[in-house]
Each structure stands twice: as C-alpha cells, then as structure tokens.
Amino acid sequence: MGSQTMAVALPRDLRQDANLAKRRHAELCRQKRVFNARNRIIGGDTEAWDVQVHDQKIKEATEKARHETFAAEMRQNDKIMCILENRKKRDRKNLCRAINDFQQSFQKPETRREFDLSDPLALKKDLPARQSDNDVRNTISGMQKFMGEDLNFHERKKFQEEQNREWSLQQQREWKNARAEQKCAEALYTETRLQFDETAKHLQKLESTTRKAVCASVKDFNKSQAIESVERKKQEKKQEQEDNLAEITNLLRGDLLSENPQQAASSFGPHRVVPDRWKGMTQEQLEQIRLVQKQQIQEKLRLQEEKRQRDLDWDRRRIQGARATLLFERQQWRRQRDLRRALDSSNLSLAKEQHLQKKYMNEVYTNQPTGDYFTQFNTGSR
C-alpha cells in the first residue's frame, strides 16, 4: 500500500512535505531559543560559547600532550645522562688503571732523574772526580778544575815562557824600526817646515801689497758712495716734503675732512654703507625716519582704539548672552515646575483609578487560577 502511495506522489506534494518539515524544524529551533530563559534574559551567544569551550578543550589537550612529550623527553634525557655518567666513571677508572700500568712499566725509580740522590748503590757506582781535562762531568759548577790545575800544567807553562820570549824579541825589533821611522819623519818635517816658512814670507809680502791696493780702492769707493748718499738723502728729503705737501692738500680737499656723505656709499647696493666712512644720516633720511615713526604712532593708536572697541563689543555681547542664559534658565525652571505639577496630578489620578480597578477586580474575580490555567500558555513560538 505504501509503495502504491509513493508511486502516485507528485513533485508538488513532495515539495509541500519538505516545506512542512522545514517549517517544523525551524519552529522547534525557535522554541528552543525562545523558551531558553538563560539565552533570552542574558542574551548569550551559545554557539560562540560552544566554540570557545571546544577551543579550550583542544588547547588543554594540546598542552597535556606537550607536557607529556616534555616529560618523555626529560625521562629520555635522564636515562642518557645516567648512561653518560656511568661511561665517564668507567673511562676514568680505565684511565687510572692505564696510568698505573704505565708508571709501573715505564716510570721505574731507577729511570728517574733524581734517582742518584737516593740510590743505595751510589758509592759503588761512583767515579773519580775527573779522568781527564776534557771530562764531560767536569762542569763549571762542579768546581773540580780551576785555572792552572790542568794535568799538562808543566808543558803548558814551558810553552808560555817560550812564547813570552818570542813576544819580547818581536817588540824590541818593532821598537827599533819605529825609532828609525820617527827620525826620518822628523827630518822630513823640518825640511818641509823651512819650505813653508819661505813660502809664507813671500805670500805675506804679496798680501801686504794687495791690501794696500785694496784699501786705496775701497777708500775711493767709500768716498764716491758717501757723495751719492748725501745726494740721495737730499733727493729723498725733497721728495718727502713734496709728498707731505700733496698729502695735506689731498686731505684738506678730500671727502674725509669735508664730510662728503657720498663717500660712505657701498658698492653692494644703496642700502649698504662703509662703516669707517659713514658720517651719519642725512637730513632727508632723518625726516623720513620721523615720518615713519609718526605713522607707526598713529597706526598703534588706531589699533588700540579698535581693540578697545572690540573689547567693549565683546563685553556687551557677553552680558547679553549671560542675561539671555539667565532668562532661559528661569523659563526652563518654570516649565519643569509646571510639568512636575502636571505629572504629580496625573500620577495621583492614575493611582486613584488603579485603586478603584483593583477594588473592582477583587469584587468581580473571586476564583483562583490553577496550574492547568498556566500550562495553556507558551505552547508555541508565535
């Protein structure tokens, strides 16, 4: 029977059934939202809260997994540290054992450098102080051989005496040769000195003759120079007098003493002057400055008058504004007072009507509502 019904169902009926099911589902969702007092009163976003709770759980799970991972890593690191510590102890023990074996095998007491100080057989092994002059044990600090205590002392002494005799004979021969050479040198020096004396006398005569000639020529030259100097001084004095006269004339006729104002003009422009030549402002400039000062005074007086008028205008406006504000506040106060009186009268009349209505309801409605009465409400979302 059901298969026959499905066979004859039209698409329009299927759409109606789907729309009906959709409206029923929407109604149930609406009832769930409307009848939930918490969401309706507080206005909380349940979906957002659920998302936050879900995110918080995910975060807690992630933190828990991270802590567990850290704990596992710490346990693994502790195991590794224990293994490394045991290995270090074992290596230290092996190293100590190897050092002991090496000392016993290769560092025996008889191989030490200071063993000869504590050797019990030192006297038996001891050698004489020296066996020859070139003995390697015969050092400077050993003090076993001093100067002149070698084994071939007599042969060496005889050889030294022969050597001294030869040196003495050689010195005598050298002294005789040096004496003969000194005599020859003295004779040559005496002869050379006599020749130098003759040459010096001749040169002295020539120098005396030349000095006389030079003195005569110098005297003539000095005389001519003195005459030229006197003439030059006369010319210089004359030129100096002429220059002084020309300078005085130029100063008297120049711009400095005549106080020409044009001399202070600068080549950089008409607004610039030369400070060391400026003699002060001209009468036209002073008049121009006084005129500008008068104009500035008049302008300042005009600005002061405008400021005074502006201040008076602002004071007048401020007083008018304060007066208007005071009047507006008084008007508002009167309106509020009238409104409060009207509101009090309206509240009083409403209270009387409510009291009468309550009294009427108490007289008319005598039965009390039961639970069935309240269950018929809030059955739908509309």
UniProtKB/Swiss-Prot annotation:
The gene is RIBC2. It comes from Homo sapiens (Human). Residues 222-255 form a coiled coil. Expressed in airway epithelial cells. It comes from the Eukaryota. Its main location: cytoplasm. GO terms for biological process: flagellated sperm motility. Microtubule inner protein component of sperm flagellar doublet microtubules. GO terms for cellular component: axonemal A tubule inner sheath; axonemal microtubule; nucleus; sperm flagellum. It is found in: Cytoplasm, Cytoskeleton, Cilium axoneme; Cytoplasm, Cytoskeleton, Flagellum axoneme. Keywords: Cell projection, Cilium, Coiled coil, Cytoplasm, Cytoskeleton, Flagellum. Signal peptide: none annotated. InterPro entries: RIB43A (IPR008805). Belongs to the RIB43A family. It holds the Pfam family RIB43A. Microtubule inner protein (MIP) part of the dynein-decorated doublet microtubules (DMTs) in cilia axoneme, which is required for motile cilia beating. This is RIB43A-like with coiled-coils protein 2.
